[in-house]
Amino acid sequence: MSAAEPLGDVIALKIQELRGRQSTARPLVRIDNREATANAPFQFDTAEACLHRNGCCAIPSGSRTALYGLWQIPPQARAFACPTCRPGDDDEDEMASDGVKDYVFGMLSVLDQFGSVIRERGREFRESAEGRELTAGLDGLYRNLEDRERATLQVVLNSLDTLLSTVAELDKSFDGGRSHNGNGAASRNGDGGHS
Amino acid sequence: MHRPAATGPSRSAASHGLTLSGDELWQPDSAQIERVDELIRGYRREVVTGLEPSVRAHYPELLEDPGGEYRKMLELSTKMTLVGHACCEIAGYPYDERRRLNGTLFGCCCFLADSFIDDFGPDATREYLERIELLLTTGWFDVRTPREELFYAIVSRLFAARDVLDPILRQAILLLFEAQRRDTELRLGDAIASLPRRELLTLLRLCARDRSGHAITVLTGFVAPEIELSLLPPLFTAGALIMHIDDHGDCFSDLRHGRLTYLNQVRNPAATLRRIFLEHIARLHAGLPANDGRDLMVAFLTRYFLTRLEKHRLERKRSDSAWAVYE
């Protein structure tokens, strides 16, 4: 790591190196949601400023490449409703995601996918010059906090600890006899080697 | 949205006879045009501060500036920082330092992505498109060169700066990618040669509209925490206009490189661009909320339109330089 290279850049680039260490190729993060948006109940035409139901015959051919899928109609979009298909609340749907649960499963998946590698990297990094510098910096930061800020930080850390314990418990209960890491082996939640 | 802003002598829109019958309210006055110039000068300095450490850390060879590439990157990022300013205020948010940096990073990201697609030959173009699609579908990007390392570092910083899984932002990113791919296929494929002229022009016009229309939406998504749906059409219109203005300014260099655009294929490009400009500005002015962001966007577009007309005129005279106009 060069002196001017931000820590975030190093982490991002190191994460890419993990790809070759997976036993089974799995995505890191999927930004592509083309399939889901193509099936969304409403399509907002940004070229013509018109809100359609999915599949409306009034969508101009020139607008096909400028459509945004919507699952609900925001209040400000009602003014743009297509007079042909008259999109309304009756077709509203939930987006193919489930809010907080997605985050929990996301965390579980990262721990499962990279747990051992992250731990190994963390150990290496802690013992490196940069890691020692960061540790010193964090200690200094903690020392300089006001009492109230320290108390707040402690609450956050305790909450995080509780959350991680809950996640571990959830993981065990979800796991119950079946593997969720996709390679047929029982999940080790980062304890085993993922060579 | 993919070429640097060239800036030239300041003139008001009225001096070019740009009037809309029955409504001239949109025309920026000389103070608004001067504000654009002032902001550009300030952002030019800020962009260097924002980008140089990353370039030095990941791709220091770029600082040697072979072929003026680093300067072009700074110019594009400056333009993107300014357009980001307008977009952020249009969306109703103050353009603070962090948001300005996001605008700058997005400019740098666009410049590098364009270079992957334009500068290394057809095989590399196809391969880069595949690798960028892999990045979008899996998050994996196999970093092979310092240029790619810089690109990935910038992309990851942008992705960390905003909730990239926001439904509008992620769709805008994918729509931009699809537009870029269609544009590339159009350039690299043979099908274009057999198209009837009318169809060809429609295709080229839509391609230009989509590339920059979606790019400005992505930019807005990175500078503003939220985009109201009603703002998407006027922002898309602003982006499309920027692309047409760009294409007119780059007309001769594009033709030299065999790159067809709507504006270099129509019979009377200057008159066509003038008509497009007036139509788009009228839609923008009517569709955007009346605030400082709208005024800045209109003033920038007017300034940009005038300077690119000038660039086109100059390049017609000395058609040996693709980047003839710099301040």
Predicted regions and their residues:
Chain B
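Active/binding-pocket-proximal capping segment
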Residues: F236-I242, C251, L255-Q265, A322
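C-terminal intrinsically disordered extensions
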Residues: H2-A31, R181-L219, F305-E327
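Generic, well-ordered alpha-helical scaffold segments in large soluble proteins
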Residues: S115, D119, V218, F222, ...
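All-alpha helical catalytic cores of prenyl diphosphate-utilizing isoprenoid enzymes
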Residues: V47, L63-A86, D96-N102, C109, ...
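Primarily interfacial, aromatic-capped hydrophobic alpha-helices that serve as membrane anchors
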Residues: D142-Q171, A271-R316
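Divalent-cation-assisted or electrostatically stabilized phosphate/pyrophosphate-binding catalytic cores
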Residues: T125-S156, P196-D210, L255-L288
